From Swiss-Prot:
GO terms, molecular function: heme binding; heme transmembrane transporter activity
Main location (coarse class): mitochondrion
InterPro entries reported for this sequence: Cyt_c_assembly, Cyt_c_biogenesis_CcmC, Cyt_c_biogenesis_CcsA/CcmC
Species of origin: Marchantia polymorpha
Record GO cellular component, one term: mitochondrial membrane
Protein encoded by which gene: CCMC
Assigned keywords, A-Z: Cytochrome c-type biogenesis, Membrane, Mitochondrion, Transmembrane, Transmembrane helix
UniProt-recorded name of the protein: Putative cytochrome c biosynthesis ccmC-like mitochondrial protein
Length: 228
């Protein structure tokens, strides 16, 4: 017996109200982050003003990994239960995750250009993130043919997540090591707060996209069934 939220009718009744609440949180956090990152956070002594792109680059990178883990969990649950909502969540996650990964690659290129002299290098971290982007696209492609195959493909793709995370430690890369870890941070608090605010904003934005996209898929399926 599934929890009520996994029933499409219950989801359609409650989800729009939740989306409105998330939109409010998203606007508030974004406004706070913009103010703190532009007018409060100081310039970096090495990169000057160019470093400010980290306020969107780093949270987007976190989201690209977090969404993939959530997508993999949803895929495992689909393989175990065959519940259609888990398949919808995985499909929606692949779309949103691909966008965040592409955004990470683009902003990373603009951040790296002043430091490396080029928008792209075949660095271990950059290459593994590019592979993540292609895995997202592959998951979307497989979803069109078989949900089971797509779910298995997504689970196999989990191998790439620790590679992305630890690539700067395992190999000699141009990408700087992580400035934030469980043991502390090398970033000043005035720079750290906007990063977490943007991350929270991206998190709520992802929730909004999940709700709206899943609602659209459910409605499309409903009208398709009704027309038959």
């Amino acid at each position: 017996m599934y929890v009520p939220l996994l029933r499409p009718f219950f989801f359609m009744c409650c989800s729009f109200r939740y989306a409105q609440i998330l939109i409010g949180f998203c606007w508030f956090l974004t406004a706070m982050a913009i103010y703190l990152s532009i007018w409060v956070a100081p310039s970096d002594f090495q990169q000057g003003e160019n470093y400010r792109i980290i306020y969107v680059h780093v949270p987007a990178a976190w989201m690209s990994l977090l969404i993939y883990i959530a997508m993999a969990i949803s895929s495992v649950l689909f393989l175990l239960t065959k519940h259609p909502l888990f398949q919808l969540f995985s499909k929606t996650a692949a779309k949103i995750g691909a966008l965040f990964t592409l955004f990470t690659l683009v902003t990373g290129g603009f951040w790296g250009k002043p430091m490396w002299g080029t928008f792209w290098v075949w660095d271990a971290r950059l290459t593994s993130v590019l592979i993540l982007f292609f895995i997202y696209l592959g998951a979307l492609r497989f979803q069109e043919f078989s949900a089971d195959v797509a779910s298995i493909f997504i689970c196999i793709g989990l191998i790439n997540i620790p590679i992305i995370k630890f690539s700067v430690n395992w190999w000699n890369t141009l990408h700087q090591p992580s400035s934030i870890s469980q043991f502390g941070t090398s970033i000043h608090i005035s720079m750290l707060i906007p990063i977490f605010l943007i991350f929270a904003s991206f998190f709520f934005l992802t929730g909004i996209f999940f709700i709206l996209e899943t609602r659209q898929i459910i409605l499309s399926f409903y009208f398709q069934r009704k027309s038959q």
